[in-house]
Amino acid sequence: MPVSIFEKESRVNVPVDALFQWHARQGAIERVTPPWAPVKLIRRSGGIETGARVRFRLAFLKIPFEWEAEHVAYEENRLFMDRQVRGPFRHWTHTHLFAPDGEDAAWMKDRIEFQLPFDVPGRRLHRLAEKELDRMFAYRHRVLENDLAVHSRTLKRITVLVSGASGVIGSQLVAYLRAGGHRVIRLVRRRPVPGSDELYWN
């Protein structure tokens, strides 16, 4: 089966460096993950720079699986690229492209090259995969644009203590604040992980 290409492009009303930095922060993956396809982060080493890896558990087309991706290219304010090391696709490369549009706006494009895990007669499964990608990336771009619109209203970064940070609302609040550049301290009822932004509450 040939490699397919999916692209989604949006114009965002923030400078290109702010758009790129948002992607590099903790919380970005969690923020752009649609609620119908929840992701559980298992392990992360590094950020979005070349050599960084991320492993998580998720579902695509309602099929659960573990996914591991490695970042293989990085040019600040221009692009970063990750490829599937382990997961459901025969091939998957995701290139995140950025370009300035004047001083106060930028274009971003998600370009995915993918190959389904097995050969299927006809194009029904392929069309289903493209439809799901279109739905997911429409959601991702909308959330990113809305978050950046709010974050760009102030340059002040603050420290926030969050209780209930592991719940549905709390986990999204933590991701939203971190992706916006704020420091978040999670109030936890267990012993804090050494070196983490956690505070024990008994």
Model-found features: residue ranges?
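Glycine-rich portal/gate segments that line the openings of hydrophobic small-molecule binding cavities
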Residues: 30, 40-88, 103, 107
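N-terminal Rossmann NAD(P)H-binding glycine-rich loop of SDR-like oxidoreductase domains
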Residues: 159-180
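Hydrophobic ligand-binding cavity/cleft-lining segments
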Residues: 1-49
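Short, surface-exposed coil-to-beta transition loops
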Residues: 5-7, 64-68, 91-94
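Conserved glycine-rich Rossmann-like NAD(P)H-binding loop of the short-chain dehydrogenase/reductase
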Residues: 182-189
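Rossmann-fold cofactor-recognition segment
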Residues: 192-202
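A short, basic/flexible loop-to-alpha-helix module at the beginning of a structural domain
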Residues: 145-158
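Beta-strand/loop substructures that line and gate deep hydrophobic ligand-binding cavities in soluble
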Residues: 72, 79-134
